[in-house]
Amino acid sequence: MTLTKADIVEAIIAQIGIPRPEAREIVDDLFEEIRSCLATGEPVKLSGFGNFELRDKNQRPGRNPKTGEEIPITARRVVSFKAGQKLKARVAESKPRG
């Protein structure tokens, strides 16, 4: 199952009992705050969950898979996520679906 923003909104409605528009606004504001912080280069640290941070990747050689031609992959900035200890422990103790 994939967790979506709509699922998070529904969980907030079920647990807190606030109106849907208010729950949607809370979720949208949370994600916008994360985006804004990352856009300005600030790391986002969510206690008990993990950290989002920016990493700079250097230019490197790559290949066009169709032609085999060597092409440069440009330097870029990417978002990385590192899971916190509590999240890692929770995942480790869960049973695989199958």
UniProtKB/Swiss-Prot annotation:
It comes from Dichelobacter nodosus (strain VCS1703A). The keyword Cell inner membrane does not apply. GO terms for molecular function: DNA binding; structural constituent of chromatin. GO terms for biological process: DNA recombination; positive regulation of metabolic process; regulation of DNA-templated transcription; regulation of translation. The lineage of its organism: Bacteria, Pseudomonadati, Pseudomonadota, Gammaproteobacteria, Cardiobacteriales. PROSITE patterns: HISTONE_LIKE (PS00045). It comes from the Bacteria. Heterodimer of an alpha and a beta chain. One of its GO terms (cellular component) is cytosol. Keywords: DNA recombination, DNA-binding, Transcription, Transcription regulation, Translation regulation. This is Integration host factor subunit alpha. InterPro entries: Hist_DNA-bd (IPR000119), Histone-like_DNA-bd_CS (IPR020816), IHF-like_DNA-bd_dom_sf (IPR010992), IHF_alpha (IPR005684). This protein is one of the two subunits of integration host factor, a specific DNA-binding protein that functions in genetic recombination as well as in transcriptional and translational control. Belongs to the bacterial histone-like protein family.
